[in-house]
Design a protein with these regions (language model features):
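Buried, small/hydrophobic-residue-enriched core segments of structured protein domains
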Residues: 3-5, 9-224
Length: 224
């Protein structure tokens, strides 16, 4: 969102030391589909892959006709993925390489029309440009326009931030759930981007950044 401050000083950084379980990093060029699936299951990242229709966790025994990824979010106050993922080019590329191993068809990557940034430079995916207002960034809308799901077919989708986390697993051999989110809305004193670890306490992100409320006022905090 254009109203969200992008200063590096605005990014919340978790100070505690993190420890990680180490996983063997497979050679993607040589690894079998079964090895890829096994690592995603063992690491706990498999639920990031969602099946359409029905919007349920993908069945690892299925082979989808395609994988769809939306590289932008058209919802109000949504983060600018070109900004929050600006340091994740390598992980995004590896994530796409992983997705290619999981489908017998194509990996479809949807970007904003005339968008600048790194998304269009990613290789191994068929890129589609979309223009218009929300919900044009929703992957379901994009599937409908690119390659609709017919009776008996399944496709898989993965959120672009989750794709970077999957790529990070295959590049670094660990599950690092760090991501950047947008903190914004009418009751936020200073809209900003925050670097967090998934599962962070909401009060640690919002502390001191919610406008003073009058007695009887209620502030609703929404994630998503």
């Amino acid at each position: 969102d254009s109203s969200t401050s992008r200063g590096l000083g605005d990014v919340y950084k978790r100070q505690s030391v993190q420890s990680y379980e180490e996983f063997a990093k497979p050679d993607l060029q040589k690894a079998s589909r079964e090895e890829i699936v096994e690592l995603l299951l063992k690491s706990g990242l498999w639920p990031m892959i969602v099946q359409r229709p029905y919007g349920v966790i993908a069945d690892p025994n299925d082979t989808p006709k395609a994988v769809f990824i939306s590289a932008f979010d058209s919802a109000p106050l949504a983060p600018d993925y070109n900004y929050v993922l600006r340091a994740e080019q390598k992980n995004l590329q590896t994530g796409i390489d992983v997705m290619r191993k999981l489908t017998s068809g194509k990996v479809h990557l949807s970007v904003r029309a005339k968008a600048e940034g790194q998304m269009t430079a990613l290789k191994g995916a068929e890129t589609h440009a979309f223009a218009g207002k929300h919900p044009v960034g929703n992957v379901g809308v994009q599937i409908h326009h690119i390659d609709p799901v017919n009776k008996g077919e399944v496709v898989w989708t993965v959120n672009i931030q989750d794709l970077a986390i999957i790529g990070r697993l295959f590049n670094e051999g660990r599950v690092d759930m760090t991501k950047i989110i947008a903190v914004a809305g009418s009751e936020i004193e200073k809209p900003q981007y925050c670097r967090i670890i998934a599962g962070a306490k909401v009060d640690s992100i919002l502390k001191g950044n919610v406008k003073p409320q009058k007695e009887g006022d209620h502030v609703r905090i929404i994630s998503g």
